[in-house]
Amino acid sequence: MKFKSLPMFALLMLGGCSLIPDYQQPAAPMQAQWPTGQAYGGQGDQRSIATALPKAKEFFKDPALVRLLDAALENNRDLRIAAKNVESYRALYRIQRAERFPTLDGQASGNRTRLPDDLSPTGDSRIDSQYQVGLVTAYELDLFGRIRSLSNQALEKYLATEEAQRSVQIALIGDVATTYFLWRTDQALLELTEATLTSYVESLAMIESSAWAGTSSELDVRQARTLVNQAQAQQALYTRRIAQDVNALELLLGSKIPTDLPKNSPLAMSALGKVPAGLPADLLLNRPDIRSAEHQLMAANANIGAARAAFFPRISLTASAGSASSDLDGLFNSGSDSWSFAPQISVPIFNAGKLRANLDYAELQKDVGVATYEKSIQTAFREVADGLAARGTYGKQLSAQSELVDNYKAYFSLAQQRYDQGVDSYLTVLDAQRELFSSQQKLLNDQLDQINSEVQLYKALGGGWSVSQN
């Protein structure tokens, strides 16, 4: 008798087995330290290491931008879609997890059948009645971990979607910030253009008066009009760009831009906090997009377990208990108890290679997941390296450009003095004025590029999102 119970004992022991391959995190395909060299200004040195980024509201110092970020996080439609996707995958996980437990259903049925006389054993027609009420339970013995594997896969996909939502949030914060700074820059460029246009118009009027007096040539007049036309074209350009910036911001916000925004602070690096130097390279592994890719990889790994388990028998147990009677009034009388027990085993014998192909597909999907995970790390490393290179060079570039603006201001002032003294023609003044305007535009655009590069670096490092927030 003891030996007869061994097969059942072995089956029960198998219930603790799993055919999911042991998961091993792929080695990160990146350097242990950030790049070094002239462009990076020694930022790859990690002797003094910071461990975390400032949170978004600590990093962005501009009160108006902080107000816009709050509005975007509340109303942005992409963020709402991402949140609904998380809820959807959570529901799918709950559905799959429920498969690991027995089901219990209430059931009631009634059946009346008339048997004609030519089919009746007695030769007389009769009506048979049968009524039944009870409970039905069903359960699949997950001896080889098929259901557990599918549940783990659903869980990892749900977790991947959660991380994807965080990625959307970080991207949204970065997009709102860069669009806001572009809007501010275009406003400054329009203001500069309008001031320059006013100066050009005044110069044109003066040259036209001089031309009537015979002291200026037609060439001087044409040159002055050319500058006026160029400034008018750029005035229209920046007016259009400001409108487009507003449209882009309102799309990101999911609502109109508030009319009572705090007063703008000067557009400079002071609008941002400091991304600490010396952050370790493995901090990238905490980026939500990389964590999402790893959860997708773990989901693919779990699916291999389900594909392997499909080669083995599936055992289902169905049982019912209740009351049955040929008379509705006697359904709950003594002696009307009924029950049934129906175990079922299904063994795959021939499927034209379907199960083998399904396993191959699952293993290939895992390989795809590994490559995707590795690429996400490499992409993140490249984004941070680009940001560090920008940080290491924009300071010198802006310093040189700012000095260039100062030199053109001096050049314009000297040219004006020499014209007033009759030493040079007004063409020299116009040339100096044009170069000054161009250098001032370039300085504003360089300031924008520097600010946006720091925002992108902050975003590339994970946007202040720490694992403890997960």
From Swiss-Prot:
Residues 1-16 form the signal peptide. Gene3D superfamilies: Outer membrane efflux proteins (OEP) (2.20.200.10). PROSITE patterns: PROKAR_LIPOPROTEIN (PS51257). One of its GO terms (cellular component) is cell outer membrane. GO terms for molecular function: efflux transmembrane transporter activity. The keyword Lipoprotein applies. It is a lipid-anchor. Residues 104-123 are annotated as: Disordered. InterPro entries: OMF, OMP_efflux, RND_efflux_OM_lipoprot_NodT. Keywords: Cell outer membrane, Lipoprotein, Membrane, Palmitate, Plasmid, Signal, Transmembrane, Transmembrane beta strand. A lipid is attached at residue 17 (S-diacylglycerol cysteine). Induction: Constitutively expressed; the ttgGHI operon is further induced about 4-fold by toluene and styrene but not by antibiotics. A lipid is attached at residue 17 (N-palmitoyl cysteine). It is found in: Cell outer membrane. Its main location: membrane. It holds the Pfam family OEP. The keyword Transmembrane applies. Belongs to the outer membrane factor (OMF) (TC 1.B.17) family. The outer membrane component of an organic solvent efflux pump. Involved in export of a number of organic solvents, including toluene and styrene. This is the most important solvent efflux pump in this strain, although it can export AMP and some antibiotics. PANTHER family: CATION EFFLUX SYSTEM PROTEIN CUSC, OUTER MEMBRANE CATION EFFLUX PROTEIN. This is Toluene efflux pump outer membrane protein TtgI. The lineage of its organism: Bacteria, Pseudomonadati, Pseudomonadota, Gammaproteobacteria, Pseudomonadales.
